[in-house]
Amino acid sequence: MYYVTMKMVRNEEAYIFRSFFKSFKENFKQATIINVIMLIVAVLLYLDTNIAGNMGQTTGKILRMIFAVFTLLYVMVLLYVYPVLAKFYNSIKNTFKNAFLMAIRHLPFTFLMLVICVCPLAIFFIPSFQIQMSLILLFILFGPAVIAYANSHFFVKIFDRYIPKEPDPEEAEVMP
């Protein structure tokens, strides 16, 4: 999805479905392995946090704080790993490494994107159940794509720093 939304932000692609399925096909194997790794890490973080919650007062609090930091780092990597996969050709190891380094290096953008991802939770604070259900339905239909599109504006700015500029043919000197 990020492959298409980043192209949309740059006004580069006219065929949304064709581009989506092309990128899906190209990245399927790596994305599946990344999904499994991220799932395993999420389960381990969840289990460790629960175990820390059942420990003694001081030790449990310290471990919960440590796992909260690891969870934040996990979410930051999760935010970047799929856009990095969609934009760059890397090994899985380098995709994770680059996602982590970019998330840390561009911390203000990272936190803005996290806020964008968390904003839909505001739906649950709307007092009317009927409005909540309508908004939840809209979010299920359009939410992930809208969030990806909004975050893609930031990813384009971030990734442009890592992509070498091609010389403009008009600016290049013609040798006689």
Name each model-derived stretch.
Residues 1-176:
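Hydrophobic alpha-helical membrane segments
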